[in-house]
């Protein structure tokens, strides 16, 4: 935890308004219980919060046994907000060179689905949760979807690398045009309207199997 604390303190002194901890611990120890892995995250948050006064956001992956419970505990340990999900280096295999290399570091639009599901569930279960949604956001439509699901804010990274910084202007234009078309004057008027709690059909978020889809598929 020492480096987390040191860097957090230095960043606050440098003038940061808030701090996002991009935390990912690869759980590879077959003898470690899941609670031991989760406690590593809680310890980081607890110790960082002791040395800074600015808001602390924790950026997490979806590799947890029970995400709602884990996020609830992060808040209990002092996290002011949570970002879902971080994207990290992943390996790939080159079958021509017969070697392990790196996969693409950029997200794809299809990655939005996991983020969308958990944005809806987490925001629906805790309406006071400050939730930033990330990964798979490549256009304005994705921004609108995440806000409808309950995101407090939306993060964009891969799209800017691939399309340039102007993509932010394009996304904002789409959002404003969509709001005008639907008659909304502020984001708060529709934020979370389709969350797990407010969608009127929570089963859509809970459903994970394809049986009904394929039985209806022509």
Residue ranges and their predicted role:
Residues 1-3, 162-163:
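Acidic-and-aromatic substrate-binding clefts and catalytic sites of carbohydrate-active enzymes
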Residues 137-139, 160-161:
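Short Gly/Pro-enriched loop/turn and capping motifs at secondary-structure junctions
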Residues 93-108, 161-184:
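C-terminal helical cap(s) of enzyme catalytic domains, especially alpha/beta-barrels
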Residues 177-217:
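Charged C-terminal helix
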Residues 2-132, 138-154, 200-202, 206-217:
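Alpha/beta enzyme core
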Residues 120, 144, 148, 165-176, ...:
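A generic structural signal for well-ordered alpha-helical surface patches
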